[in-house]
Curated annotation (Swiss-Prot):
InterPro entries: Class_I_gatase-like, HST_MetA, MetA_family. GO terms for molecular function: homoserine O-acetyltransferase activity; homoserine O-succinyltransferase activity. GO terms for cellular component: cytoplasm. It catalyses: L-homoserine + acetyl-CoA = O-acetyl-L-homoserine + CoA. Pfam families: HTS. Substrate binds at residues 163, 192, 249. Belongs to the MetA family. The record marks 192 as: Important for substrate specificity. This is Homoserine O-acetyltransferase. HAMAP family: MetA_acyltransf (MF_00295). GO terms for biological process: L-methionine biosynthetic process from homoserine via O-succinyl-L-homoserine and cystathionine. The keyword Acyltransferase applies.
Amino acid sequence: MPIKIPSGLPARDILDSERIFALEKPEAERQRVRPLKLVILNLMPKKIETETQLLRLISKSPLQVEVDFMKTSTHEATHVSADHLVKFYETLDAFKDNYYDGLVVTGAPVEHLDFEQVDYWDEFKQILDWASTHVFSTMYLCWGAMGALNYRYGVRKELLPEKLFGVFPQYLQDEYCFLTNGFDEICLQPHSRLAGVNEGDIAHNPELQVLTWGPKSGPGLIATRDFSEVFALGHWEYGKYTLAEEYERDMKKGMTNVPFPENYFPHDDPKLEPLFAWRAHANLLWRNWLNWVYQTTPYDLSEVPQLREEKRLGTDRSIRHEPGSPRVDAFTPFSHDGYGVIRG
């Protein structure tokens, strides 16, 4: 939420430089308030689990948020009852005339496939086209981020030599970025993926900026320069036991070469309680994003198409470091701290 300060207060310039929302009295009196409207495109197999994880984060904001759920029409979910989908989900056709402050696009366990092999790829692109004129800001997660980066900006998806699985350090690129304001200089991010993105494609695209980066996990959080699109390559929304459940599931299947989740169990012992070491940054990211949307979205959402065409949406404040140039020279990753939490 913004703070209201006296007109002409000298601290205003400092607060502005640190990306802190402050309103002088005349601005506050003109401000109109309404609930934020979000729609979640849930591509994950376990719909209810993902709903719970995302709503848990969204609920941490003091803002009132209205949430709708979207599904694809070209792919039939098999891990949730049809009744649940009928009761709580609609396809794009039901939303095409609606406007939203935010869209959340989840990941999906299809990163090993070429985009064209995903049965809902064409529909995915249609949803992104709709969002470009009907949504103020979009948060993409994992495969959703890979797909959007490829479709929007030509960033190539690359298969990894082995699955990236565990909790990995990310280095903050700018302490005063809107989305990462309040982050520690090193934050932890869960990953469970078989693919990544081409960092060179990101570095050479003037529209993109890397907000957090890790030596092993690569870019963890990316945004457009106007923050209208945010791409999280990891899973900050994951609960404490999600990685453990994935590991146990694959072990019970008798799969060979099941990767062990790195930096997750104390002393790498799966009999011990896993560490929930990313929760604070997950909550802070989502609070920051919702707060930024609240401060900058138009009161009348039907103005989004015109404002976007005129390039008057968003903030257009770039981070202080050159996009694609990870700022790691000042930091040394911790290692062998007794828990093995910061390796990699």
